[in-house]
UniProtKB/Swiss-Prot annotation:
The lineage of its organism: Bacteria, Bacillati, Bacillota, Bacilli, Bacillales. Catalyzes the interconversion of ornithine to glutamate semialdehyde. It catalyses: a 2-oxocarboxylate + L-ornithine = L-glutamate 5-semialdehyde + an L-alpha-amino acid. It comes from Halalkalibacterium halodurans (strain ATCC BAA-125 / DSM 18197 / FERM 7344 / JCM 9153 / C-125) (Bacillus halodurans). This is Ornithine aminotransferase. The gene is rocD. GO terms for molecular function: identical protein binding; ornithine aminotransferase activity; pyridoxal phosphate binding.
Amino acid sequence: MQSSTSAVIEKTEKYGAKNYHPLPIVISEAKGVWVKDPEGRKYLDMLSAYSAVNQGHCHPKIIQALKDQADKITLTSRAFHNDQLAPFYEKVSKLTGKNMLLPMNTGAEAVETAVKAARRWAYDVKGVPDNQAEIIVCEDNFHGRTMTAVSLSSNDEYKRGFGPMLPGIKVIPYGDLEALKAAITSHTAAFLVEPIQGEAGIRIPQEGFLKEAYALCKRENVLFIADEIQSGLGRSGKWFACDWEDVKPDMYILGKALGGGVFPISVVCADRDILGVFEPGSHGSTFGGNPLACAVSIAALEVLEEEKLVERSYEYGNYLLTKLKEIDNPIIKDVRGRGLFIGVELHEPARKYCEQLKEEGLLCKETHETVIRFAPPLVISKEDLDWAIEKIYYVLKP
């Protein structure tokens, strides 16, 4: 017999570490953009597991790929080749235009991989003295929860009690080209940036920043690394958020929707002159590039292509953004976004509004305390989007 919502939450609170503060809802079933709790109540998902479910929950093609591959082989480790890794490599290489890839499992692992690659490149190729390489990042970034990722963060709460932090990191204001110029030295290995900052509240740098920052990095022989874990794969209305400024970074970091919301997989994409610094034994992952993840990822990318979800994100994102900007309420400070990646910033904490929306059957989550993030699966229909807009109007209109 299925447990009730209250029973599940009670048991979760009893045994689980308190490193999350979820809304009081239990999801036991999901399909497309709709989810259900144990009592059968339906909710429209406007979070998409932080953009990991761009293709919708339990997409039949992706689930079938999982089932088919699970009947054959799931894990070989990288001690042997597997027959799914090569087609995965080829698919992602064609998508990104990069000729060398390194697969991992989670986004944070891929960030770790990119930082390791940048540092070794700085020593082996650029000629930076040993142990003096520097990585430049932006204030309010979010690159994960591992030690490297929290060392990159400017959020003191993410760091509290976890020191000492990784050295060799400089933090500049997001979107500040002059600060980037001032931070670069002969020891700078890379500039790591989110083209749209998700956890910071869907922050978009001023127009031209990415292009100018990339050009600056090229002039100074600094790697430009784009963390597209959340903003990539159609979420922003383009394949990659960098595409809004026609920037092709030296390194892409991809994750989340790369696994179609079904299986974790991430990847660092660059060219041979960068990722070629790795040699056998210098980096690895038992599960990285496993056949199950690769088969799922190929299907996930095919769904984005075949169902034109990038184009849908662009069209419906513009529609949703326009509708949200029409809400006339003094508590709203700003409405911003690209594609189906939209933030409504308030003059007060957003949590209570997310809780009210939950009661209306719409699931979203506050970020950066005062921002409501709206990021539904890209498969959302116009009808369902209009239903969501109606609920948002009901909660946010004065």
